[in-house]
Amino acid sequence: MKIDVNQFLKPCSCGRKHEIVVDDIIIDSGAINQLPEILKRPAYADKKSLVMICDENTYEAAGKQVEALVPGLKKIVLDPDNLHANEHGVEAAKKGLDEIGNVDMMIAVGSGTVHDITRFHAYAMKIPFFSVPTAASVDGFVSTVAAMTWHGFKKSFTAVSPVVVIADTDIFKKAPLRLTASGVSDL
């Protein structure tokens, strides 16, 4: 199922105008296989230095597939033990980004934590990112805010939404039930 993002450009009941920067939302069985074709589109074809940010669990869940589909993809695989959307998670990803050097675009492969860390860096680096969620565990995949715990305090950082979301239902089906349940309660 391809979502027509233009349907979200209608006036909002809150009276405010909300900007939509997501070009594509694809939710389907096997959706991940569309990644190579999407990357060939004119808006992304010039992106030569792509980096995937994931953790060890999400690498197994979908990162290996992304890596196989995108030749030359560099990766940052974070340690999932005690990984949180906080200054430590941000610093771990930054270390990997610094080691890689030039980056044109990122691909977040994971759920809320990985997405918040990725969107934080994409905003700071002024580059786009793609979203490949591995579980329907949060409702904020297209958020423009990185919700973090910073030095022990909850804080919302201005960030960017992904330009493309590729939500593969075959991957979601394999996610732990507790993650899906947390997504239902996040709504």
Q: Which role fits each region the language model picked out?
A:
Residues A62-K64, I117-R119, F141-V142, P176-L177:
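Short glycine-/acidic-enriched loop or helix-start segments at secondary-structure transitions
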Residues M1-M105, S182-S185:
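ATP/NTP phosphate-donor binding region
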Residues E99-A135:
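A short, small-residue-rich loop immediately preceding and capping a beta-strand
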